[in-house]
Curated annotation (Swiss-Prot):
Span of the signal peptide: 1-22
Domain observations: The number of the intragenic tandem repeats varies between different S.cerevisiae strains.
Annotated region described as Disordered, given as residue ranges: 206-299
Protein name in the entry: Cell wall protein TIR4
Entry similarity comment: Belongs to the SRP1/TIP1 family.
Residues spanning the membrane: none
Length: 487
């Protein structure tokens, strides 16, 4: 059920049960808050030392709230208003911890609306009775003419001109606020009334007091509503103008009343509001309406422009660093195995190094007969295969290579190769396996390996052949003896 309908029914109930409007307002606020935030009340009732209990709710409140929740479209709950203890309602309002944050602002707004409505109604009724012009005035109009300028002005404005008509003329205006207009204060331009005199107030300003400006009448209070202020009064509309609500105030300002529009124009909700509002002496201050000078034009709500946080997830490659050789070219790269091989054209090198299976990332570089294997985060172990340079029978040959990122030049020839291993304890450098050997040395070493394999194969064959010969050497006699034993 709409809140406005609840308010209307509550007002009718107030008339029926002789309650004051202030008491009805308090009841409306409690009912609306209980219906919207029932969980808060239940939680508070179970909070120790809160002093609040659902059993101590004012009489009739829970019955009405239960009926509202069960049948929100049923108006019969208003019959329960006679059971409400209104004095207890006022006491209960101040007991809850959200009184100042939720309940009090609602009460102040409703009380302000009540004060404004009653004040404006009184003013408009007094002026309406005195504003009908005398038919014997000096102005003459043709027969059957209508009075084209009549007004309802607030008590502080003076009706300067009231057009008259002869005895046959009919006064068709002298308006009061129609009941269908949803305006906080009275006096809008009456239906079918024509105001031919100068209409004061443009679409960007509002008159804070309730008045329909007659010809030459002085608008005693004008204001420019700042943003987020509540505009509670209505103001003038000139001929054939349609009074539209929410005429002034951008964004979050709440326009309670209908306000001014110039001739045949509609005041729209997007009309600009200027600062430096001027308020005359007879402006009526209405509760939370803040019409102040040099007020901020726009009430911008804090729009959370949430920063787009981009998380860049990069699949890091191997953390190893290769020993940068001359003119190095990446021959292949595999992120799965985390291994990259770079080769600088060696002397027909056939050296192959297999990285350890426990290595987290491996870089194998073969450069000019030198094989370097580097592994991250392992104990530093340097395995070096070098040539035996003791032989001087051959003419030295020039060999250039890289040893652990350092260019190495030698002028020797290798007759034999020998392997040596040295171990150092250092976790800050990479594991490096270096083979320094020229092509002649590598070829000789390869030939030695092949030779050893050949010899091993020969021994195996000889053993097999010997075993075969031994079996055959046993001869038929041994077989005959075995056969005889079996028999």
């Amino acid at each position: 059920m709409a809140y406005s309908k609840i308010t209307l029914l509550a007002a009718l109930a107030a008339i029926a049960y002789a309650q004051t409007q202030a008491q009805i307002n308090e009841l409306n606020v409690v009912l609306d808050d209980v219906k919207t935030n029932i969980a808060d009340y239940i939680t508070l009732s179970y909070t120790p030392n809160s002093g609040f209990s659902l059993d101590q709710m004012p009489a009739g409140i829970m019955d009405i709230a239960a009926q509202l929740v069960a049948n929100p479209s049923d108006d019969s709950y208003t019959t329960l208003y006679s059971e409400v203890d209104f004095s207890a309602v006022e006491h209960m309002l101040t007991m809850v911890p959200w009184y100042s944050s939720r309940l009090l602002p609602e009460l102040e707004a409703m009380d302000a609306s009540l004060t404004t409505s009653s004040s404006a109604a009184t003013s408009s009724s007094e002026v309406a009775s005195s504003s009908i012009a005398s038919s014997t005035s000096s102005s003459v109009a043709p027969s059957s003419s209508e009075v084209v300028s009549s007004s309802v002005a607030p008590s502080s404005s003076e009706v300067v001109s009231s057009s008259v008509a002869p005895s046959s003329s009919e006064v068709v205006s002298s308006s009061v606020a129609s009941s269908s207009s949803e305006v906080a204060s009275s006096s809008v331009a009456p239906s079918s009334s024509e105001v031919v005199s100068s209409s004061v107030a443009s679409s960007s300003s509002e008159v804070a007091s309730s008045s329909v400006a007659p010809s030459s009448s002085e608008v005693v209070s004008s204001s420019v509503a700042p943003s987020s202020s509540e505009v509670v009064s209505s103001s003038v509309a000139s001929s054939s103008s349609e009074v539209a609500s929410s005429s002034v105030a951008p964004s979050s300002s709440e326009v309670v009343s209908s306000s001014v529009a110039s001739s045949t124009s509609e005041a729209t909700s997007s009309s600009a509001v200027t600062s430096s509002s001027a308020v005359s002496s007879s402006t009526e201050s209405v509760s939370s309406s803040s019409v102040s000078s040099s007020s901020a034009v726009s009430s911008s709500e804090a729009v959370s422009s949430s920063p787009v946080s981009s998380v860049v997830s990069s699949s890091a490659g191997p953390a190893s660093s290769s020993v940068a050789p001359y003119n190095s070219t990446i021959a292949s790269s595999s992120s799965t195995a985390q291994t990259s091989i770079s080769t600088i054209a060696p002397y027909n090198s056939t050296t192959t190094t297999t990285p350890a299976s426990s290595a987290s990332s491996v870089i194998i570089s073969t450069r000019n007969g030198t094989t370097v294997t580097e592994t991250d985060n392992t104990l530093v172990t340097k395995e070096t295969t070098v040539c035996d340079y003791s032989s001087t029978s051959a003419v030295p040959a020039s060999t250039t290579g890289y040893n652990n990122s350092t260019k190495v030049s030698t002028a020797t020839i290798c007759s034999t190769c020998k392997e040596g291993t040295s171990t150092a304890t250092d976790f800050s450098t990479l594991k490096t396996t270096v083979t320094v050997c020229d092509s002649a040395c590598q070829a000789k070493k390869s030939a030695t390996v092949v030779s050893v394999q050949s010899k091993t194969t020969g021994i195996v064959e000889q053993t097999e052949n010997g075993a075969a010969k031994a079996v055959i050497g046993m001869g038929a006699g041994a077989l005959a003896a075995v056969a005889a034993m079996l028999l």
